[in-house]
Amino acid sequence: MKFIHLAMTLAYSLPHIVDAFSTLSHQRIRTSNVGVSSIFTNSQRITTFSATPTTRRTTSLFSTTENKKSSELVSNQDLGLGTSGFSTSRIRNFSIIAHIDHGKSTLADRLLESTQTVAARDMAAQLLDNMDLERERGITIKLQAARVLYKSEVDGEMYILNLIDTPGHVDFSYEVSRSLAACEGALLVVDASQGVEAQTLANVYLALENNLEIIPVLNKIDLPAADPDRVAEEIEETIGIDCSDAVRASAKSGIGINDILESIVKNVPPPQPDTGGPFRALIFDSLFDPYRGVIVFFRVVDGAVKKGQKVRFLASKAEHDVTEVGIMQPNQVQVDCLRAGEVGYLCGSIKDVLDARVGDTITLSSEYKAAAAKLDPKSEEDPITPLPGYSESIPMVYCGIFPVDADQYENLRDALGKLRLNDAAISYEPETSGAMGFGFRCGFLGLLHMDVIRERLEREFDLDLIVTAPSVVYRVEKGEGDSKTVEIVDAPSKMPEILREMKVMEPYVRMEILTPSEYNGQIIELGQERRGILKDINYLTPTRSTIVYEVPLAEVITDFFDQLKSRTQGYASMEYQLIEYREGDLVRLDVKINYEDAPPLATIVHVDAAQTVGRRLVASLKELIPRQMFKVPIQACIGVKVIASASISPMRKDVLAKCYGGDLSRKKKLLQKQAKGKKRMKAMGKVNVPQEAFMAVIKLNKSAGD
């Protein structure tokens, strides 16, 4: 019996013993790999560990059964990326430019998926769009970058492809231009069913300004309405790019993805080799991490940077010690060094995103000081030449943001401060309104930027907000010659009431509208209503045309785009860019409610439209402001002159209801008592203006012809 019991015990324990030996052998294998670092092929997932937990890294390229050509391990030396003999000949830096809904983010997903940069289980729609807001709206707000390894099917060589995904909206055109400056090529993605759109043209012009090699990609060829031949001809006629070798693809279905990758390898030129000069890198984005500080994304142009060095940002003149450098796959992966031609990130315990502005140049502090020592102390020449194209982000649209609950003012201030950490283009300063209390006057790059920030404040920080009508930045010039002064006006309430001997300058934009030719008449009519100056009409094809206008920006930021879509049944698209400031015959239209000024409702309008806008604004406010127990007069004024007025009739209590008859003097006494009470209430009462009333100004701040 003892023997049988011992045999049963061994039989039960044997699987556990085998598992223990198996685990031990795996641990020995893992231990033998400590300190080994590799660059991995498309078909492998390998995790490497350094000797200390503090420097542990994970570098992964995920395996699938689809691609078995690249099963061998590729080392740094195989790619020419060793510490010596570094080569840039197999690096390709490219971007994707497209109009909204033409499939840019979907194509980026397919490129990451087909190269096994991201495993199928980790894939998600719009993978590079991290914010929920981006996925809901189908737009890219915050650009992303990803490093992809691809083994060419033509020459069998392994290539590093750095994809820099860019926002596509006109509000972020400067960020797009800096991202394109970090590339040598761009995929021009055009919907094969819709053809060339306005934002397509705008982004192509930016790419051409940066001398990028443009690869046309006709996307969505699997749609029933797709006509790639027509669209290819349209691209050639509109942009002048040869489309004979255009890649025909469908990002959704995965058609033509390998052709796109091969075209990138073949047509996009590699980065320029290292010239041996001082380290210089171009910043194309930054974000704030609560644990590591500001993370700076950049493209190395000359030299190299590694952990432990001190870097200097030329525009902000800030200096920081580098605590980490790495690449994006698309998750951040630490590396030892980044050299010329590579795209990566660095951390340096940077606390303010303004220290690392988009478009700024990074250099090594030691090299900067060495170069400065060789210059004449009186010389104004830069010791190290900054990379061209840098400019500071200038807000184009301003609005007031107030909390509905006055107790949330501190929360609003903290929320704006946190958003500012990730977005240096936001500007804000405290503002006080008698009607709405304490809030902030905020500046944005455009209407989309403003709308995105408002929605993030409400969604991420749980704030109830009142947002006033947006306004542009005006310039008021006083005097002439040496005594001339210029006052910047970013709010209607700051505009001087009396504009005698003053010039009011307003910003103008050059607007390019792409539309089916049958809607040309409606668009020209809309342009005339908005004080536009028609500059050009160009017929791309017999059925499509471009219309160029110069329009005051104030006429664009209201509902111009909505009107354009409405009058063209949604087929037209537009893009615009600021050109200059011009003198305008403008006046400040004030609103008084119950004889008290309401500064948030003030607006700046053209003098010819003031009468009409005033009447419509007063009528709209009359409908939106709730009735009170007393009569509420509403007035639209230019200076002291009332140009339109209306009154909200009071709610009336029937004080005679209890008098079934009797003495007339009793009724008069009750009516007189009621009148005295209403008079006192009118003198002391406050009128609460709802959010809808402020939004009404947005719709009414346009010319009288509309």
Curated annotation (Swiss-Prot):
> Principal place where this protein is found?
mitochondrion
EC number(s) per entry = 3.6.5.-
InterPro entries per record = EF-4 (IPR006297), EFG_III/V (IPR035647), EFG_V-like (IPR000640), EFTu-like_2 (IPR004161), G_TR_CS (IPR031157), LepA_C_sf (IPR038363), LepA_CTD (IPR013842), LepA_IV (IPR035654)
Q: In the UniProt record, which is one GO cellular component term?
A: mitochondrial matrix
Q: Which GO terms describe its molecular function?
A: GTP binding; GTPase activity; ribosome binding
Family listed: Belongs to the TRAFAC class translation factor GTPase superfamily. Classic translation factor GTPase family. LepA subfamily.
Q: What is this protein called?
A: Translation factor GUF1 homolog, mitochondrial
